[in-house]
Amino acid sequence: RSEISHCLPTMLDAARQVAGNEYQIIVAAAPGVEDAFYQPFIQGEILTRDTYKVLTEAKAAIVNSGTATLEAALIGCPQTAVYYIAGSKYLEKLLRPIIFSIPNFTLVNIILQGQVIQELIASRFTTENVAHELQRLLYDQEYRKNMLKQYQQLYTILGDTSAANNAADKIYTLISNCDETNQ
């Protein structure tokens, strides 16, 4: 709930700036969080629990970093990932060397070993940055096409069956290799 309270207002402000009358904003509710919790944030947007259907039909998504980024990629939805760090102004200053030395935070970027989707984390998670990235996702056809093309590599890496196990194995291998190079 805290994560939703911190992230959703910025996500919605950015989406409202970009959507205008051209796009409908849909909020996919998190499992276990009742609809009433979302009401103070929603101003005419649609609230749904059918996340997969929304991602299938969406032209673009703003996704809170986590497994949802991988799900959106496997569905084929262009996205940007956001993540709020509580006390981020102070924590970021303290943890900056660690936070920004990690090349990728999202599962998509970790598995594909590159910056496929934009990660707006800590102080980079602002309404302006999210709106800018959302505009790129919606209107820059080359950018969208490239992202979707890179998503196809996920199927090769993860395979057609046991995607979750393959993803876990790949992430474990990458983390193990990272630990070995840092020792």
What are these regions (language model features)?
Residues 1-183:
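Nucleotide-activated sugar donor-binding and catalytic core shared by glycosyltransferases
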